[in-house]
């Protein structure tokens, strides 16, 4: 059974988690609640992308233009959901996903004491195994992508408003 995924603007983070059923996904929400879904993080991300008729691979390739990396690129699903990957666990077996995704479209804060973590809009802390410098770099890239998406959306709205005004004089 496919669980219903929350709205993009409600998702603060998407984390891989080992459960008795195997790899699962914990979704942290902006209000502090959590949802556990019975699928891998990759499947959850694919489902989030597909409801916007988007491809994970194409979004990651597009983000590589900003990051100049081949892997661990942000997934910009929508202006409300720009997911930045961060390493949160060691794999139990080779091939296990080790990356969580944090939504930089919502307020996130890097916490370095006692260990590196990202604090979400809902106040949850996501422990990160990377260095402070690497985390800051990934968050900055995601914020840059988010700002560009917002700017493109604003330009689109202004163009539509201008066309509407032009038609009113006909």
Per-region residue spans from a language model:
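Eukaryotic intrinsically disordered, low-complexity regulatory linkers and tails enriched in Ser/Thr/Pro
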Residues: 1-102, 106-170
């Amino acid at each position: 059974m496919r669980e219903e995924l929350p709205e993009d603007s409600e998702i603060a983070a998407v984390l891989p988690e080992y459960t008795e059923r195997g790899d699962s996904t914990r979704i942290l929400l902006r209000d502090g609640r959590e949802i556990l879904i019975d699928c891998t993080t990759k499947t959850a991300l694919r489902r989030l992308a597909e409801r916007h008729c988007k491809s994970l691979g194409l979004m990651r390739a597009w983000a590589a233009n900003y990051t100049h990396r081949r892997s661990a690129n942000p997934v910009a699903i929508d202006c409300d959901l720009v997911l930045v990957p961060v390493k949160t666990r060691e794999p139990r077996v080779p091939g296990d996903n080790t990356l969580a995704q944090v939504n930089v479209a919502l307020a996130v804060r890097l916490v370095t004491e006692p260990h590196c973590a990202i604090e979400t809009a809902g106040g949850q802390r996501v422990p990160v195994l990377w260095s402070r410098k690497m985390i800051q770099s990934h968050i900055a890239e995601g914020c840059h992508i988010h700002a560009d998406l917002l700017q493109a959306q604003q330009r689109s709205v202004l163009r539509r408003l201008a066309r509407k005004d032009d038609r009113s004089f006909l």
